[in-house]
Amino acid sequence: MEKSIINSLLNIKEKYQDLKSQLNLPEIIADIKKYTKLSKEINSISEIVETFDEFLNLEENIKSSKELLDIETDAEVIMLAKEEISQAQSKQLELEEKLKVLLLPKDKNDNKDVIVEIRGAAGGDEANIFAGDLYRMYTKWCQQNNMKLSTLDLSPAVSGGFTLVTFSIQGEKAYSKLKFESGVHRVQRIPVTETKGRVHTSTATVTVMPEIDDDIEIEIKKEDLRIDVFRSSGNGGQSVNTTDSAVRITHFPTGIVVSCQEGKSQIQNKDIAMRILKSKLYDLELQKKQSEESGYRKLAGSGARSEKIRTYNYPQDRVTDHRIGYSTSLNYVMEGRLNPIIEELLLEEQKEKIAQAGI
C-alpha cells in the first residue's frame, strides 16, 4: 500500500482513539447533544479503523511467517508457512481495495437525520392516495431498520392519503440511506374509483433534506418572515381545534412556505416549522452545488425535483428504479423492504466516486 495512504490511515486511527477517550469525559456524558455528535463522528470512521487494524494484523502475521522461513528446515512447516503468507497477502489486497473505497470523499451530510416531504402531484385523488402509500412504506422501513419517524405536518386529502405530509427520520446514516429517494415517484394501477378497469398513471414527489445541526449556521432575518397562526386540525392533543396552535411560516426571499400543527402548543409548532424551514434553505444550497458536480449526474440526475426516478407498477407487481435499471417486487417494497434498492443506489454512488478519484 502507498505510503501516503498508510499515513492517512494512521492519522485517522489516532483521531479515532482520541475521540473514544473524549467519549468518557464527564462533561461529554452529561451533554446529550455533544455525546450524540461525538458518537456519530466515531461511527463514521470506525469501519476504516477496524479494517486498517485487520490489515496491520495480517502484516504482522506475514512478517512472523517470513521470519520462520529463514530458520525453519522442516519441509512440511515451510510449506504451511508459505501457504499462510500467500493467504494473508491475498486477504491484504482485498483489504487494501476496501480501504481505498472507505477513504473516498464522504458526503458530509451522510450521518445526519432527515426531514422528508411527500406531496400528491399529478393525478388528482389517486396521487394523494399514493402519497399516503409512500408515507406508510417509509414508516414500515423505519420500523424494520431501527429508525425513529416523527410526523411534523399532515394535510389529509378528502379522498384519502395526503396532499402533503412532512416527517423527520432519526437514525444511523439516515441521509446516506434516503438521499436518493428525492424525486418523482410514479404509480401505475387501477384506482378504486375506476369503473372500467383502466390503468391510470399518477405521481407523488418526495423530497429528502438533511436536518441541520448546531454545526451549520443558517441566517434567517426576522424581516424576511411572515408567521401566521391558525386553528389546528391535527393530533396535537386537547388544544386541537380550540386554540390557534398551528403555525405557518413564509420566507419571502425564496417563497418557501412551511407549516406545522402536530405539536401540542403554538411554541412547539413554531420551533418545528423553523426546523423545516432551515432544512429547506440548506437543501436549496445543496441542490445548487450538486448541479455543478458532473459526477453526481446519474443518481441525482439534473438535480431537479421534477425528475422521475421510480415507477411502481401494480398490475405487474414491479418497482423499477430508472437511474440504475433495477427492478424488484412491488409488494415487497411497499412493505418497507427498501434496503435492496438503497444498497444498489449506494453501490452506484461508490462506483461514481471511484471513477472520479481515478482509483
From Swiss-Prot:
Any single Pfam family the record assigns to this protein: PCRF
Keyword Protein biosynthesis among record annotations: yes
Location in the cell: Cytoplasm
Main localization, broad class: cytoplasm
Molecular function GO labels: translation release factor activity, codon specific
Keywords annotated in UniProt: Cytoplasm, Methylation, Protein biosynthesis
HAMAP family per UniProt: Rel_fac_1
The protein's role, per its UniProt record: Peptide chain release factor 1 directs the termination of translation in response to the peptide chain termination codons UAG and UAA.
Family per similarity comment: Belongs to the prokaryotic/mitochondrial release factor family.
Stated name of the protein: Peptide chain release factor 1
Species, as recorded: Mycoplasmopsis synoviae (strain 53)
Gene: prfA
